[in-house]
Swiss-Prot record:
It is found in: Peroxisome membrane; Cytoplasmic vesicle; Endoplasmic reticulum membrane. It comes from Rattus norvegicus (Rat). The keyword Transmembrane helix applies. May interact with NGFR. Interacts with RPN1, RPN2 and CANX. The chain crosses the membrane at residues 6-26, 62-82, 89-109, 115-132. The keyword Ribosomal protein does not apply. Residues 135-167 are annotated as: Disordered. This is Novel acetylcholine receptor chaperone. The lineage of its organism: Eukaryota, Metazoa, Chordata, Craniata, Vertebrata.
Amino acid sequence: MASPRTITIVALSVALGLFFVFMGTIKLTPRLSKDAYSEMKRAYKSYVRALPLLKKMGINSILLRKSIGALEVACGIVMTLVPGRPKDVANFFLLLLVLAVLFFHQLVGDPLKRYAHALVFGILLTCRLLIARKPEDRSSEKKALPESAEEQPSLYEKAPQGKVKVS
């Protein structure tokens, strides 16, 4: 049976991956929801207006929205379907993306209810990355500790000859 750690990583990976595929698709096409698509268009226009550096670099709201949407879809697919290290890399890119989105929301002065989902999914991405990068607990390889006092060697037996260990 799979360990609880593995089940947690798989569940978070699939849920987060599907969420980002969905959100990225909304940014790319109005087929899923015309209202959400038009809201995304409006929001990204305000992000570009609030950050003139993007205009100087030649990045307009359409390019920004489509590139973020494509990155979300690609990383979401990797998080959902691809095993191993690429999943952690996609997790890291999505975490950076969430931080950028939080920055944009703060920049334009959006209320908390507009970006609360980004906070929650940023925390979930962080948790998934921490759990995935934590080394596996190898309790079976550890030596079993003696259970009774008779099985425990005395301090005298542990100490080198001629020396007594004092603790």
